[in-house]
Amino acid sequence: NLGFTVGNKKYPEQRITLKNTQQVNPDPENLKRIERELAEQITAYRTFSPNTPSNLLLDKPVNGPLSSKFGVRRFFNGEERNPHSGLDFAVGAGTPIKTPAAGKVILIGNYFFNGNTVFVDHGQGFISMFCHMSKIDVKVGQQLARGGVVGKVGATGRATGPHMHWNISLNDARVDPAIFIGAFQP
């Protein structure tokens, strides 16, 4: 038997101030909305199609500087919330967002925290999610080639300005997208 120990990792912290306090401490009506939306998103994250991913070496969905890394501990208005589940790229509103690999659109929506959002199934439990979009340019069921435009960068949902949030889920576990990007090193 081989064993191993998983050690603790200290992630950097990010402190964000939001004017809309509902985005930090939602009222009961918004909590119900968030719960409904989370159920939809969990279903998307748990999608497993038999298609083999076209490539696990992914393109960046946008070209621009990284503004927030995966795993960053987040504090909104001084209150700790979930760690950052993806990568944020600081790019201007309206910048086209391209799918990093071929896939099928499995969910779109306008969500409380994520704003306009698109989920793409790349196959075998490998899912991309793009958030805070100003415009969604795809429909559920649409097949996309690598580099296909899913929408435009925006600042919808819990966002302090235009940026592109991208996360990867592998069999319903959020993983750092940076490990799948060619020569990109955050």
Where are these regions (language model features)?
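Non-catalytic extracellular/periplasmic "stalk"
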Residues: 1-65, 69
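Catalytic cores of peptidoglycan-degrading enzymes
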Residues: 59-186
